[in-house]
Amino acid sequence: MAFTASDICKIIVAVILPPLGVFFERGCGADLFINILLTILGYLPGIVHALYIILKY
């Protein structure tokens, strides 16, 4: 799997604001709402989920 420039930008955004990184990758859907919930419950779970979504798709 090769990383593109957009993947790198999404990863940087995901570390700063995890829901925004998920939104850029998947749009407004269940993944975004799960990530918002995880970010509210704890910042680190939100980052992990965002990175998982970005690297998976």
From Swiss-Prot:
Record localization: Cell membrane
Record keywords: Cell membrane, Membrane, Transmembrane, Transmembrane helix
InterPro entries on file: PMP3 (IPR000612)
Keyword Transmembrane: yes
A Pfam family per the record: Pmp3
Coiled-coil ranges per UniProt: none
Cited PROSITE patterns: UPF0057
Membrane-spanning intervals of the chain: 34-54
Broad class of the protein's primary localization: membrane
GO cellular component terms given for this protein: plasma membrane
Membrane topology, as annotated: Single-pass membrane protein
PANTHER family, alphabetized: HYDROPHOBIC PROTEIN RCI2 LOW TEMPERATURE AND SALT RESPONSIVE PROTEIN LTI6 -RELATED, PLASMA MEMBRANE PROTEOLIPID 3
Its job: Plays a role in the regulation of membrane potential. Could mediate a proton leak.
Protein family: Belongs to the UPF0057 (PMP3) family.
The protein, known as: Plasma membrane proteolipid 3
Lineage: Eukaryota, Fungi, Dikarya, Ascomycota, Pezizomycotina
Gene for this chain: pmp-1
